[in-house]
């Protein structure tokens, strides 16, 4: 038996998120269908991040155990890509220890959020950028982001309810203008709550337009109340860019 970790890129536009759901097209479901065709048996998988509907990935990591000992990582990569649809692609595969779990072994997760800051929309980019036609001040956004760095209770930035702790650690936020009209917000952390990154982006963009003062970020964080936060940024601008492990380079 071999355990593999696949580094996967996907266009999330036509998926109902990562996690398997009944009668829905999901990344995990489609990936497991490809594995079943290769193995002639159901093969369970374990992902590093549960991206929401419409969210993309460049560095999702999906682990699984195979009884096809003859297959090298390269052979497995080729077999998977031959059986996957054209909106998912395996970039590389690593052989990992039998107890490896990408969800729990991850040391850091890096998300990128892309914003098209133009007066007119670009229809060819509409699935991958949040079109934001208003002027924004990136320095104000950077000031606000500093309040979010470190370990905090991010209840105000959570959508929905679950049993997980709301204490999370953000290790870095970078706000860059890649080109004249493209803004990148890069958020790094150990793990995130549901829609946490999109909620952070929504707040930062409101700060950038002058709708909220940067120092108000601290009050919103400490309020532990989702209703204090502006609307979440849309899903289609978000990319799970990279997951970092000790075991291998992604």
UniProtKB/Swiss-Prot annotation:
- The entry's active site is 52 (nucleophile)
The enzyme's first-digit EC class, named in words, is isomerase
Q: Which organism is it from?
A: Kosmotoga olearia (strain ATCC BAA-1733 / DSM 21960 / TBF 19.5.1)
Residues binding substrate, per UniProt: 111
Tell me the gene name: truA
Q: Which reaction does it catalyse?
A: uridine(38/39/40) in tRNA = pseudouridine(38/39/40) in tRNA
Q: Which family does it belong to?
A: Belongs to the tRNA pseudouridine synthase TruA family.
- Provide this UniProt record's keywords sorted from A to Z: Isomerase, tRNA processing
UniProt protein name: tRNA pseudouridine synthase A
* GO MF annotation list: RNA binding; tRNA pseudouridine(38-40) synthase activity
Gene3D superfamilies per UniProt:
Pseudouridine synthase I, catalytic domain, C-terminal subdomain (3.30.70.660), Pseudouridine synthase I, catalytic domain, N-terminal subdomain (3.30.70.580)
Q: How does it assemble?
A: Homodimer.
One Pfam family, short name please?
PseudoU_synth_1
Q: What is the role of the protein in this entry?
A: Formation of pseudouridine at positions 38, 39 and 40 in the anticodon stem and loop of transfer RNAs.
- EC number(s) in its UniProt entry? 5.4.99.12
Example GO biological process term?
tRNA pseudouridine synthesis
């Amino acid at each position: 038996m071999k355990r593999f970790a696949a580094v996967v890129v996907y266009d999330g536009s036509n998926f109902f998120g990562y996690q398997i759901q009944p009668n829905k097209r999901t990344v995990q479901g489609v990936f497991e269908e490809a594995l079943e065709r290769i193995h002639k048996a159901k093969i369970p998988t374990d992902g590093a991040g549960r991206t929401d509907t419409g969210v993309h990935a460049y560095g999702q990591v999906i682990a699984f155990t195979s009884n096809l000992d003859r297959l090298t990582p390269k052979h497995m990569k080729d077999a998977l890509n031959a059986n996957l649809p054209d909106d998912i692609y395996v970039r590389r595969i690593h052989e990992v220890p039998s107890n490896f779990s990408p969800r729990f072994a991850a040391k850091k997760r890096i998300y990128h959020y892309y914003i098209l800051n133009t007066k007119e929309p670009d229809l060819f980019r509409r699935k991958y950028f949040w079109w934001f036609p208003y002027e924004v001040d990136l320095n104000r956004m950077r000031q606000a982001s500093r309040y979010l760095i470190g370990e905090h209770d991010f209840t105000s930035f959570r959508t929905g309810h679950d049993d997980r702790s709301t204490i999370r650690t953000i290790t870095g936020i970078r706000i860059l203008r890649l080109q004249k009209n493209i803004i990148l917000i890069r958020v790094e952390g150990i793990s995130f709550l549901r829609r946490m990154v999109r909620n952070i982006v929504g707040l930062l963009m409101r700060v950038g337009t002058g709708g909220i003062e940067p120092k108000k970020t601290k009050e919103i964080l400490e309020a532990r109340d989702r209703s204090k936060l502006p609307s979440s940024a849309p899903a289609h601008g978000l990319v799970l860019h990279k997951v970092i492990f000790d075991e291998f380079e992604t």
